[in-house]
Curated annotation (Swiss-Prot):
The lineage of its organism: Bacteria, Pseudomonadati, Pseudomonadota, Gammaproteobacteria, Enterobacterales. Keywords: ATP-binding, Cytoplasm, Helicase, Hydrolase, Nucleotide-binding, RNA-binding. It is found in: Cytoplasm. This is ATP-dependent RNA helicase RhlB. Residues 402-414 have a biased composition (Low complexity). Residues 40-219 form the Helicase ATP-binding domain. One of its GO terms (cellular component) is cytosol. PROSITE patterns: DEAD_ATP_HELICASE, HELICASE_ATP_BIND_1, HELICASE_CTER, Q_MOTIF. It catalyses: ATP + H2O = ADP + phosphate + H(+). Its EC number is 3.6.4.13.
Length: 421
């Protein structure tokens, strides 16, 4: 398959419902990405799909296009009740559910189908008010969906389409029992269109597809290369004492337009945030302890460009559609090999190039061999001159609880620090 981001296949070439094509073209979507070109012929023919593709390759639009087309082309059951959605899209995190909902809104506006959103943390009554008026497509996280179902606010007996996004992450977060609970309350698999999409399709995910789908077709895009070919990967071996100064020096040298820094723990993320905020960077903090409204605001500020750097745990590593991320820093090498792929997949998206920089410190260097085995190649190593690391650094800011902590706007040019060799 061509390595280009878009294929020659156009959405208008398929027998899609005219309103769906109109909505796509209005948003500037004309040509399909590889995963869309593979999925749509199957879903339009009523076949179930389990799809694997690198993040940022259009999985969301593949299943949204299929969902809207199916609902427009097949009427709802005759005795459908107001609390019965016709399609259910399940996501592992609140942020991903919100982003899927945002991506679906232009299609909903063009087609007249109603959207609902259900996620935990806040907004219970607001979400419920929308559901009580009746929705066609319900997007949500499993916990809140089960809550509404147990109270009979929603009934899944009229489901015509079901989507499971980031299925491997569902397993990682322990949601698989919830998913099975929801599936048991839907019509049989052969009476609905089933789609499962993820950046990785492990054995356990395939087992779930076998259980809950109707003879699904497996489709894959570039499975032989787990890390995007547009991403420049780079690895440093700092001591624990030099690690923070190396990160700050690299940021000054690279001066990224939009960067995400990943660390393995909430405490480490707070520490990184404190150093960067004190040094005048516009930096946001995203961990599981940050309140939901604040998390969404931080993501919005980062997406708009009001923040240059986002420091995050792996809560932000999967599924989030943040455009134009130029750099990803792995301050800590992840314990899970798949998380490395998902982290660096935040950059190099939508045909753009990206830069991933990883720090293999004394604490996490032991994770490197498994990561390199998993991705199928060694990460190129760069050296640095310890004497050139930044030393004129302010005392880090401290916080008693996670908050956004925007530093002042960066001014002037970056300090001229160069690496060795």
């Amino acid at each position: 398959m061509s390595k280009t981001h878009l294929t020659e296949q156009k959405f208008s070439d398929f027998a899609l419902h005219p309103k769906v094509v109109e909505a796509l073209e209005k948003k500037g979507f004309h040509n399909c990405t590889p995963i869309q070109a593979l999925a749509l012929p199957l879903t339009l023919a009523g076949r179930d799909v389990a799809g694997q593709a690198q993040t940022g390759t259009g999985k969301t639009m593949a299943f949204l296009t299929s969902t809207f087309h199916c609902l427009l082309s097949h009427p709802a059951i005759a005795d459908r009740k107001v609390n019965q959605p016709r399609a259910l899209i399940m996501a592992p995190t609140r942020e991903l559910a919100v982003q899927i909902h945002a991506d679906a809104e232009p299609l909903a506006e063009a087609t007249g189908l109603k959207l609902g959103l259900a996620y935990g943390g806040d907004g219970y009554d607001k979400q419920l008010k929308v559901l009580e008026s009746g929705v066609d497509i319900l997007i949500g996280t499993t916990g809140r969906l089960i809550d509404y179902a147990k109270q009979n606010h929603i009934n899944l007996g009229a489901i015509q389409v079901v989507v499971l996004d980031e299925a491997d992450r569902m397993y990682d977060l322990g949601f698989i029992k919830d998913i099975r609970w929801l599936f048991r309350r839907m019509p049989p698999a052969n009476q609905r269109l089933n789609m499962l999409f993820s950046a990785t399709l492990s054995y356990r995910v395939r087992e779930l597809a076998f259980e809950q789908m109707n003879n699904a077709e497996y489709i894959e895009v570039e499975p032989e290369q787990k890390t995007g070919h547009r991403i420049k990967e780079e690895l440093f071996y700092p001591s624990n004492e030099e690690k923070m100064r190396l990160l700050q020096t690299l940021i000054e040298e690279e001066w990224p337009d939009r960067a995400i820094i990943f660390a393995n723990t909430k405490h480490r993320c707070e520490e990184i945030w404190g150093h960067l905020a004190a040094d005048g960077h516009r930096v946001g903090l995203l961990t599981g302890d940050v309140a939901q409204k604040k998390r969404l605001r931080i993501l919005d500020e980062f997406t708009r460009g009001d923040l240059d750097i986002l420091v995050a745990t792996d809560v932000a590593a999967r599924g989030l559609h943040i455009p134009a991320v130029t750099h990803v820093f792995n301050y800590d090498l992840p314990d899970d090999c798949e998380d490395y792929v998902h982290r660096i997949g935040r950059t190099g998206r939508a045909g753009a190039s990206g830069h991933s920089i990883s720090l293999a410190c004394e604490e996490y260097a032991l994770n490197l061999p498994a990561i390199e085995t998993y991705i199928g190649h060694s990460i190129p190593v760069s050296k640095y001159n310890p004497d050139a690391l930044m030393t004129d650094l302010p005392k880090p800011l401290r916080l008693t609880r996670p908050r956004t902590g925007n530093g002042p706007r960066r001014t002037g040019a970056p300090r001229n620090r160069r690496r060795s060799g």
